[in-house]
Amino acid sequence: MGDEYLAEPEDEVAISMWPENIGDKHQKQFKMEKLGKDQDALEDANFQQKPSSVDLNRLMELANSEKGVSQMQYFVKHWEYKRANTARLLKEQIGLLCQQRKEIEQRKQQILEEQQFQDESYYAVKRQVPILDEVYKDEWKRPSKKNDDLSHNQELKIDAEYDSISYWKERAMQLEKTLEASLQRERSLEEKLEENIKNLQSHTPVEEFSGMLKRADYFLHLVLQSAPIVIAHQDADLRYRFIFNHFPTLADEDVIGKTDYEILSGEGIEEMNNVKKEVMASGKATKREFVFNTPLFGAKTFVTYIEPVFSKSGETIGVNYVAMDITDQVTRREKMADIRVREAVQKAKETELSKSLHITEETMRAKQMLATMSHEIRSPLSGVLSMAEILATTKLDKEQYQLLEVMLSSGDLVLQLINDILDLSKVESGAMKLEATTFRPREVVKHVLQTAAASLKKELILEGCIGDNVPLEVTGDVLRIRQILTNLISNAVKFTHEGKVGINLHVLDKQLPGCRIEGGQLHSKAHSAPAAAAEHFSASPRKCDNDTLGCSNHEDACQTGIPSNDNFGEHHEGDEVVWLRCDVYDTGIGIPEKSLPLLFKRYMQASDDHARKYGGTGLGLAICKQLVELMGGTLTVVSKENEGSTFSFVLPCKIPVKEDHSDDPDDMPSSGGDFTTSDIEGSFIFKPQARPYLLTSGVSVMNNTKLIGGNQFYDPPNILEDRKPFSNGFVLAEDHSTNSASTAHQSNGPSVSRTNKEQHDNAMVIELNRQAERVSSSRGDTTSVSGLIHEERGPCRVHEEKSLHKKSKCSPSSNKAKILLVEDNKVNIMVAKSMLEQLGHGIDIVNNGLEAIRAIQKRQYDIILMDVHMPEMDGLQATKFIRSFENTGCWDTSVKPEHDQIIAGSDNLSDCAHMKKQGKRVPIIAMTANSFSESAEECLAAGMDSYISKPVNFQNIKECLQQYLPPQ
């Protein structure tokens, strides 16, 4: 063994291949000894020694099985291998220690020999003994020890006088200590080896296996002790062989060996057993949710995972299942779903509300635009027509009368065109409102034909036929129905040169196909076959096998509901609804087949030749169609060129609860005259040889009655009660057969005087128009009426107006009334002033509402004519101030705060004492060019008594003064 290996052997100790904690590692790796209390965490755990539901017989059966025996043999072989390996390692360590001991002894012997040699030469000559270079080098190269105080960079210097014997003695003592420590470690290892051998001999594989199973069982109980699950095993008969975490009310003997039916009862048990049988039959695992409601644990929801158990031969011998209570999760899930539904509904409502708000805003803007356009256009037109009417009261020659008649007629046409455009715009923007009133269909048809016959100059026969099944009274928008009929009759007269024009009204035996009454609301579907529908409902007096055009290219208005006012279109359960069909037929020029698709489009006519020859804007039929659809009906046409046309519309109408047949004017007998009637058969005819006059002022206003292509004669039921029925059964005119000559002569010029009979007839017509205008003005819509049939009017209108003016002007001066006119437009001031002065009344003029209040404070007036739109203060605000003063006796400044100082400054005026009379109320009449019914409602709400629509005329002003001025 060389010097390099023996260098400093006393400081070198061979490193053992066994760690110091060999016992602990061995115990942790092989678990061959019982762990101490401080090492086994499960030893200190306090398990509840509850009766386990483990089948011990089953466990022993598994241990004695072939697989269990093979596992036991494996554990025995593993234990023997570990024991042999441990003995081998110990022997190797002991051999290494013995070798190190021998080397140390040899080194010690060498040191002793060297020391003896030095002792023998001690008494020789003393000299410095240098250390050999080899020894110096060896000492320098020797690795530093743990307790060595010399640094590697320090030079080794030994004095020659150094005592070598002491040095080597110290070295020997150090080696002795190292050897003793090594021997002590060897003895400790031997003791541990003997102890491990004893421990290995005291343990058997069965005990170790049992301990492992016990620890696993304790761990399983610890994990599943508080888990919300049920684990169970059932055999092929679905009897429990094992269950864990069952309900505490049941003992082991109440569960083991029994089925679900024997343990539980209630909802969900049968369903779960059927699923278990399906799993056993199919051999596939499944996962389901079961809802139980049993007396044992109440209503619960479990999510269950069921898997089959197979034998070695592959047969299904049972099922294992794991069930977890998810009742709280299901409840939260249902709540979340309900919250999501409510959020979706709320979001949908917000979206719908936003859409409705947007639509409402658009509608309001459209209505505002229409109101502005109506006001801005009708105001200057009012000045033109009113001035022309005033001019008609002056002295004119024949040519001037004719020119003035043309001027009035043209103004009427312009005003009618404006009304048509406004009607169409209101329908399309949703601003058109319908009003449900009770009316008599027979009278409507009768007066429409009567109005058309009044100005008819063609050799045509106007006839009407009312079915026996038509009710005496129905509920609907009579003004819109009259507007549709008048327009269709006007077109029929315009395009018919000879023959007849008529109206056929009857009730359908069944309702319109595609329409139904559900929930009190009218619904319909678009018609897929309009031609078939038209042929099915064709009831024209003549055979109409012609081309048919319906409303198929437009969605039926009643599908989305009918815009309503006063519950129009709302049919309550129990209300009887009838479907009225009206056919307007003629024997005129007809309509070419190629023009039928364009018939109901705006600004479209059958051909350019028709437009040049007959005139018109092409809006009449479009408005009729939209009005019919707005009321929930349909409009169709059957026509053939050169053979005539038949326009038919069907409308739903309600029958009033009470009907009184005793005072029906249609049931009165008639005889003689210029027409014949048969009330029993419901038919009447207007013959062409005599046509009664109907006075139609070009600037007269028929409120809420906008007709296309002709005038209208409004005859509300309350007027019918006041009028005297004539001998011919009608209420418009008496027998005019004797007056036809004078009527024809009168049309030649205004200078020819008329007979007393004609004057009486015209006076009757004027009175009827006055009452009609008064009733219809309460509805708010205003329309200028041009003439009964535009191309058929005569020049007698100027003369009649002049005659009416002369009668009005002859009033005595004692009837002079004090009138305040509040108007900012100079033209309107001139018109009203001229008319009022010619009627013999005094007038004061102011330009805005503030000036009107100051004028009222200084003077008492019999009536106030007030414009609505004015600067500084409009008519509505001024009316509120006036009504507030009349009620309280003082000027209330709370109506308009910005005018507090202006109004308050005049409270002390002594001139306003006349206004403080108790109960004194000055009539205030609005003068507006707005054609919307909302304008009338605003006026009445502000405190006004009535209103006059512009353009104004003598008739309107006279009626107003007669109604509201106190009798003189």
From Swiss-Prot:
Which residues get modified to Phosphohistidine?
Answer: H375
Catalytic activity, reaction form: ATP + protein L-histidine = ADP + protein N-phospho-L-histidine
The answer to whether keyword Membrane applies is no
Q: Where is the Response regulatory domain?
A: 818-965
User: Per the database record, which ranges form the Histidine kinase domain?
Assistant: 372-655
Q: How is it modified after translation?
A: Activation probably requires a transfer of a phosphate group between a His in the transmitter domain and an Asp of the receiver domain.
Bridged cysteine pairs (disulfide): none
Q: Which GO terms describe its cellular component?
A: plasma membrane
Q: What is its EC number?
A: 2.7.13.3
Q: Any coiled-coil ranges, and where?
A: 89-120, 169-204
Q: Where is this region: Disordered?
A: 737-757
Q: Name one GO molecular function term.
A: phosphorelay sensor kinase activity
For biological process, the GO terms are: cytokinin-activated signaling pathway
Polar residues compositional bias, start-end: 738-754
The record's keywords, sorted A to Z, are: Coiled coil, Cytokinin signaling pathway, Kinase, Phosphoprotein, Transferase, Two-component regulatory system
- Residues where 4-aspartylphosphate is found: D867
The record's annotation in CDD domains points to: HATPase_EvgS-ArcB-TorS-like (cd16922), HisKA (cd00082), REC_hyHK_CKI1_RcsC-like (cd17546)
Record function comment? Cytokinin receptor related to bacterial two-component regulators. Functions as a histidine kinase and transmits the stress signal to a downstream MAPK cascade.
Q: Which PANTHER family match?
A: HISTIDINE KINASE 5, TWO-COMPONENT HISTIDINE PROTEIN KINASE
The free-text domain remark for this protein reads: Histidine-containing phosphotransfer domain (HPt) contains an active histidine that mediates the phosphotransfer.
Protein name according to UniProt? Probable histidine kinase 1
Gene source species:
Oryza sativa subsp. indica
